[in-house]
Amino acid sequence: MKGVNHYKKYKIQPVEFAQANELNYCESNIIKYAVRHKDKNGIDDVKKIIHYAELLLELEYSDK
């Protein structure tokens, strides 16, 4: 699979990992931003991880 430079150093692309493990949208975005934050957008990507984690909490656990 083709990949952009900030993912090429990994054995598997985040999208391939997400697909193989049937991750939902929030989970796959958390993985994507966690993998790339050091090579691309730094703190902005970490903030996106937090955003998607909070969204995951709301969607999956708000009634518990």
Predicted regions and their residues:
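Intrinsically disordered, low-complexity regulatory regions
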Residues: M1-K64
